[in-house]
Amino acid sequence: MESELSANVIDLCPVGALTSKPYAFEARPWDLKKTETIDVMDAVGSNIRVDTYGWEVKRILPRINEDINEEWISDKTRYACDGLLKQRIDTPYIRENGQLKKTTWENAKKELINKIKSFSPNEVAGIVGDLSDLEMIYSFKSFFNSIGSNNLECRQDRIYINPEERINYIFNSSIKGIENSDLILLVGSNPRLEASILNARIRKAYQNNNTKIYSIGDPGDLTYPYEIIGSNTSIIKLIAAGSHEISEKIKKSKKPIIIIGESALYGEAGRYIFETIKKFLFTNNFIRNDWNALNVLTQQASRVGAIDLGLYSIAKNKNFSFFDKLENGLFKFIYLLGADDINFK
């Protein structure tokens, strides 16, 4: 079975003939501690239950939430827990003479404080990783504010964001709202890989409502038919000007949805794509209280919350000022909070 949701057949099996191989013979259900929580493998926010035995996570199961994941979870969500037990860093290390050596938390804190004190606030920067929880992010920001530095960023890439309004960086139509849409336009997005639960909703909308689906860019097999209308930013310009056939289709639709993927938001081109689409939707009254067709599909669980907390450095008309300073070597000390994807070359 080729599907990102294939393991859900385990939950569907009425007699227990289909079982989870990694969980087989691991524990008895009544011995497990059950904790209800939220999935962090993508930005969908699927409701899950984590079953633990002692310190080990034995299995992850879906919880019903009709507004988000219904009763499904992705295979990635279900099986990612096998990496939680082994090869974990459970003690701090300090590099001495090119070698990492174990140390105590007290010594690590002293080393950190001494390093930070040796630089001015403008030379100190912090980057938050994609799996950092909001309480940790808030504490991280408070710490930087206490030393007089505002050089904070939650983006490990040059993704364009407009934090002036919250609607600029969230999925406004809601996941459940996909089922009510009569037209969906994907812009630089592959929902099957980026958010498989959301992709299942799009498939459901197509099957039940015959929703028309279009894409700018070729995302490959999405498990439902769609029409590719172009592959570059010139299509966005034509749509905004009303000179592309999809423009009229969007205008005639009752509840259109435009999903902008992160790959369409890189750099200054991302600024143009987002702002042009938003202006087009606003002009045609598709950004309303009862229906908002503007949707940004992020891939990181903590990205929206970090933006809400102000973890970004944006100067006037410069969305990427933090990265410009980083590339120009203006930061002498960089504090990475779970940020592993920064390329310092």
Named regions from a protein language model:
Residues 2-6, 10, 16-345:
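Catalytic alpha/large subunits of respiratory electron-transfer oxidoreductases
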